[in-house]
């Protein structure tokens, strides 16, 4: 080991190993597919509590629901959700 070395494997050794690519050729596509399913099934909207694209505007409310006064924000949000 050279002076100041932490004893860890060099990064070039890791990314040129067959074991690295066997593991990552499975995990990287699996993460991509899991993320795509999370968003496409709508679970992301449910998990984070955001409205779906068709729920931003209802039949009764066509204006943009923007909170304009920070001190009366609760009342404004209640008015937006009551309509």
Swiss-Prot record:
Residues where heme binds: 24
UniProt KW tRNA processing keyword: no
GO process terms (BP): photosynthetic electron transport chain
Keywords of the record: Electron transport, Heme, Iron, Membrane, Metal-binding, Photosynthesis, Photosystem II, Thylakoid, Transmembrane, Transmembrane helix, Transport
Pfam family, one: Cytochrom_B559
Cofactor binding: number and manner: With its partner (PsbF) binds heme. PSII binds additional chlorophylls, carotenoids and specific lipids.
Subcellular location: Cellular thylakoid membrane
Cofactor dependency: heme b
InterPro entries listed in its UniProt record: PSII_cyt_b559_asu, PSII_cyt_b559_asu_sf, PSII_cyt_b559_CS, PSII_cyt_b559_N, PSII_cytb559_asu_lum
Role this protein plays: This b-type cytochrome is tightly associated with the reaction center of photosystem II (PSII). PSII is a light-driven water:plastoquinone oxidoreductase that uses light energy to abstract electrons from H(2)O, generating O(2) and a proton gradient subsequently used for ATP formation. It consists of a core antenna complex that captures photons, and an electron transfer chain that converts photonic excitation into a charge separation.
Family of the protein in this entry: Belongs to the PsbE/PsbF family.
Subunit description: Heterodimer of an alpha subunit and a beta subunit. PSII is composed of 1 copy each of membrane proteins PsbA, PsbB, PsbC, PsbD, PsbE, PsbF, PsbH, PsbI, PsbJ, PsbK, PsbL, PsbM, PsbT, PsbX, PsbY, PsbZ, Psb30/Ycf12, peripheral proteins PsbO, CyanoQ (PsbQ), PsbU, PsbV and a large number of cofactors. It forms dimeric complexes.
Protein name, per record: Cytochrome b559 subunit alpha
